[in-house]
From Swiss-Prot:
Family: Belongs to the CheD family.
Species this chain originates from: Rhizobium etli (strain CIAT 652)
CDD domains registered for this protein in UniProt: CheD
Pfam families, alphabetized: CheD
Protein name listed in UniProt: Probable chemoreceptor glutamine deamidase CheD
Domain of life of the source: Bacteria
Reactions it catalyzes: L-glutaminyl-[protein] + H2O = L-glutamyl-[protein] + NH4(+)
Length: 184
């Protein structure tokens, strides 16, 4: 058995997802109001995690068009990434984490994120086998995608505020898609 110290750690930041089949890998992230969905196919031995800032989609008029921040986009990418690597939709299971109410003056986007993730998975027929959402403090999350094991650590008030500051920054710019064709 591999000890935790020997695990290959892959950190997921806001707007990212990762799919792995390495039994020695652990996915990690830090969440405030953001949500991480952890999905896996226990038979295929493959799993993954995403980290999204807002529910909904980038097509709404107020979104700014950055799809990587939105739950709809990242949930689809995660599910499709699993299916492309051999998972079967009918065997997928999920765990949901995050969605804290980290700033009292803002609307409760964390609650909206968690509700969105639960509804999305319900609509897709993917059972949620575990969750830890809400509260007033952020979390550090570790997820072993092959075994489905998850562990979280609550953040202190100061750590939560640092996480909130990171979540409010714009997502990293995406590389432009090459749309021109050059003929020789």
């Amino acid at each position: 058995m591999i000890t935790e110290g020997a695990a290959r750690r892959v950190h997921i930041i806001q707007g990212e997802y990762k799919v792995l089949s390495d039994p020695n890998a652990v996915l990690s992230t830090i969440l405030g109001s953001c949500v991480a969905a952890c999905l896996r196919d226990p038979v295929a031995g493959i799993g993954g995690m995403n980290h999204f800032l807002l529910p909904g989609s980038a097509t709404s008029p107020t979104s700014g068009g950055d799809a990587t921040r939105y739950g709809v986009h990242l949930m689809e990418l995660l599910i499709n990434g699993l299916l492309k690597q051999g998972a079967r939709r009918d065997r997928l299971e999920a765990k949901i984490f995050g969605g804290a109410k980290t700033i009292s003056t803002f609307s409760n986007v964390g609650e909206q994120n968690a509700a969105f993730a639960m509804q999305f998975l319900r609509d897709e027929g993917i059972p949620v086998v575990g969750s830890s959402t809400g509260g007033e403090h952020g979390r550090k999350l570790e997820y072993w995608p092959v075994s489905g094991r998850a562990r979280q650590y609550p953040l202190t008030g100061a750590e939560t505020q640092r996480t909130v500051a990171l979540e409010q920054r714009p997502a990293a710019p995406q590389k432009p898609v090459e749309t021109s064709i050059e003929f020789f």
